[in-house]
Regions:
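N-terminal helix-turn-helix
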Residues: 1-37, 196-204
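A cytosolic small-molecule/anion-sensing beta-strand core signal
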Residues: 13, 61, 168
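Amphipathic alpha-helical effector-binding/dimerization core
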Residues: 18-112
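A short, flexible beta-alpha/helix-coil linker loop
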Residues: 23-26, 115-116, 175-179
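Short hinge/gating elements
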Residues: 29, 118-119
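Short, structured loop/turn "capping" segments at alpha-beta junctions
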Residues: 104-109, 116-117, 139, 143
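Cysteine/selenocysteine-centered motifs that mediate thiol-based redox chemistry or coordinate metal-sulfur cofactors
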Residues: 108, 113-114, 192-206
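Extended hydrophobic
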Residues: 121-194
Length: 206
């Protein structure tokens, strides 16, 4: 048994194995979120350089987006921070994650308002938020066009597990709006490629 040979498990009796206490001790302090952060961060750093923007990986926690990892491109610092949170209904990552909720979960969220207006572009009407989430799900990406902050423009795509579940989302964020639809498409191509790479890194058990 490879796991036994590597010292990761120990045999308690014939046919029964348990985690090696020494191995468990080494894992103290590691949570699933911490592991995800360590896996994703170096990939985000490469993406940030390629896109020349700040990149994020986020998950949904208590109806808020939590940023588990962030990579900054020089000169493109934005106000977000790792382990910090933003509203989901108006952020690109949040729209992606909300759009992949079950119908009942999404309906519960939509009826949980009110939804504060953060900028002139923030969508706050529950019916319009629902339509925006539907558009996000259909097209496969989320957009924050100055809805969280007047000088913040983001585009995000989902990261799937091998079983088709959404484990999080990655985004490209900049203080400059994309110059053209082509630039947006180019970003999406790279974002989707990286999302697939993260899925592969997580492995078949994810």
């Amino acid at each position: 048994n490879a796991l036994h040979s590597a010292g990761l498990i120990c045999r308690s009796k014939r046919g029964r194995y348990l985690p090696n206490p020494v191995f468990l001790k080494k894992l103290e302090g590691f949570t699933p979120h911490a592991v995800l952060s360590e896996i994703v961060r170096p990939i985000l750093e490469q993406l940030s350089v390629a896109l020349e923007t700040t990149t994020h990986f986020g998950i949904l926690e208590n109806d808020m987006v939590t940023y588990l990892a962030k990579a900054v491109f020089e000169g493109e610092e934005v106000f977000t921070r790792e382990k910090g949170q933003l509203e989901a209904y108006c952020s690109a990552i949040g729209k992606v994650l909300l759009s992949h909720m079950t119908v009942d979960e999404r309906q519960a969220y939509i009826t949980s308002g009110p939804f504060p207006k953060l900028t002139d572009k923030t969508i706050t009407d529950p019916a319009e938020i629902e339509r925006e989430l539907h558009r996000t799900r259909i097209r496969g990406f989320g957009v924050d066009d100055g809805e969280v902050h007047n000088a913040l423009y983001c585009i995000a795509v989902p990261v799937f597990t091998s079983r088709g579940m959404v484990v999080g989302a990655i985004s490209s964020s900049s203080s400059q709006r994309w110059a053209s639809p082509k630039e947006q498409r180019d970003r999406l191509i790279q974002l989707n490629g990286v999302a697939q790479s993260i899925s592969s890194t997580l492995g078949a058990g994810a």
